[in-house]
From Swiss-Prot:
Keywords: Amino-acid biosynthesis, Branched-chain amino acid biosynthesis, Leucine biosynthesis, Lyase. Pathway: Amino-acid biosynthesis; L-leucine biosynthesis; L-leucine from 3-methyl-2-oxobutanoate: step 2/4. Catalyzes the isomerization between 2-isopropylmalate and 3-isopropylmalate, via the formation of 2-isopropylmaleate. One of its GO terms (molecular function) is 3-isopropylmalate dehydratase activity. PANTHER family: 3-ISOPROPYLMALATE DEHYDRATASE SMALL SUBUNIT, 3-ISOPROPYLMALATE DEHYDRATASE SMALL SUBUNIT 2-RELATED-RELATED. NCBIfam families: leuD, PRK01641.1. Heterodimer of LeuC and LeuD. The lineage of its organism: Bacteria, Pseudomonadati, Pseudomonadota, Betaproteobacteria, Rhodocyclales. Its EC number is 4.2.1.33. The gene is leuD. The keyword Protein transport does not apply. Gene3D superfamilies: Aconitase, domain 4. It catalyses: (2R,3S)-3-isopropylmalate = (2S)-2-isopropylmalate. This is 3-isopropylmalate dehydratase small subunit. Belongs to the LeuD family. LeuD type 1 subfamily.
């Protein structure tokens, strides 16, 4: 997993509440268990005017010109502003996979669905809960300013606006450490590889019949 330290990036505003996981990545794309390749189908039913299918070349599909991610000013965005209850609906790890594969590293919203919130940290996304009034200001500034950027400093736990105002946010210390170091569940386990090998060797010596 790629470490997250400081991100200074373009922001895209998704001004919708209760964005569920089926909107983030529709059900027909869940057959694959690869973590990559979902970016072109992120928000598929909103981004395109047709119905997408797995394996389809999205480059020639008709796009919805009104959808935020299809607007030129938001190309390359790595920070997504959202509204309440982002990531609700059915549990699917494909949702953070699709957001990360598209290029997003940070999602800022007043609240998140619990399972999506937890899955995001495990897949290199930083979900930030921000007060709705503070978030309203970010939406207003973003929509009024082309090329609007935010600086997110995980170590300092701050979001810095273009006008220089720093906004503090909370993050669980363990999740923060994992993101800063790029540790997913496998990475955390491999940190103890020597102890695991020692335990296995000891167990094999003490109970050889288990391994016969």
């Amino acid at each position: 997993m790629k470490p997250f330290t400081v991100l200074d990036a373009i922001v895209a505003p998704l001004d919708r509440a209760n964005v569920d996981t089926d909107a983030i990545i529709p059900k027909q794309f869940l057959k694959s268990i690869k973590r990559s390749g979902f970016g072109p189908n992120l928000f598929d039913e909103w981004r395109y005017l047709d119905v997408g299918q797995p394996g389809q070349d999205c480059s020639n599909r008709p796009k919805n010109p009104d959808f935020v991610l299809n607007q030129a000013r938001y190309q390359g965005a790595q920070v997504l502003l959202a509204r309440d209850n982002f990531g609700c609906g059915s549990s699917r790890e494909h949702a953070p996979w699709a957001l990360e594969d598209y290029g997003f590293r940070v999602i800022i919203a007043p609240s998140f669905a619990d399972i999506f919130f937890n899955n995001s940290f495990k897949n290199g996304l930083l979900p930030i809960k921000l007060d709705a009034a503070e978030l309203d200001v970010l939406f207003q500034q973003c929509e009024a300013t082309e090329g609007y950027r935010l600086k997110v400093d995980l170590a300092a736990q701050t979001i810095t606006r273009p006008d220089g105002k720093a906004i503090a946010f909370d993050v669980d210390p363990f999740r923060k450490e994992c993101l800063l170091n790029g540790w997913d569940d496998i990475g955390l386990t491999l940190r103890h590889a020597d102890k695991i090998r020692d335990f296995e060797a000891k167990r094999r010596a003490e109970h050889p019949y288990y391994f016969a």
